[in-house]
């Protein structure tokens, strides 16, 4: 039987790519700026 090798955790997901994590760094803010300019419905995972 095959095993699931990738098990994501929501806490890490939020910590790494959540809105507040993006706002914390200059490059993260650039990411948000690009996504706003593109017109994304969701700017970040959160």
Curated annotation (Swiss-Prot):
Keyword flag Ribosomal protein: yes
Any GO molecular function: structural constituent of ribosome
Pfam families in alphabetical order: Ribosomal_L34 (PF00468)
GO CC aspect terms: ribonucleoprotein complex; ribosome
UniProt cross-references to InterPro entries, sorted A to Z: Ribosomal_bL34 (IPR000271)
GO biological process, one term: translation
Entry superkingdom: Bacteria
Keywords noted in UniProt: Ribonucleoprotein, Ribosomal protein
Keyword NAD: no
Entry similarity comment: Belongs to the bacterial ribosomal protein bL34 family.
Descriptive protein name: Large ribosomal subunit protein bL34
Organism the protein comes from: Synechococcus sp. (strain JA-2-3B'a(2-13)) (Cyanobacteria bacterium Yellowstone B-Prime)
Underlying gene: rpmH
């Amino acid at each position: 039987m095959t095993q699931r090798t990738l098990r994501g955790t929501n806490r890490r997901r939020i910590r790494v790519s959540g809105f507040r994590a993006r706002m914390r760094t200059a490059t993260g803010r650039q990411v948000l700026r690009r996504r706003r300019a593109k017109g994304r419905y969701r700017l970040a995972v959160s």
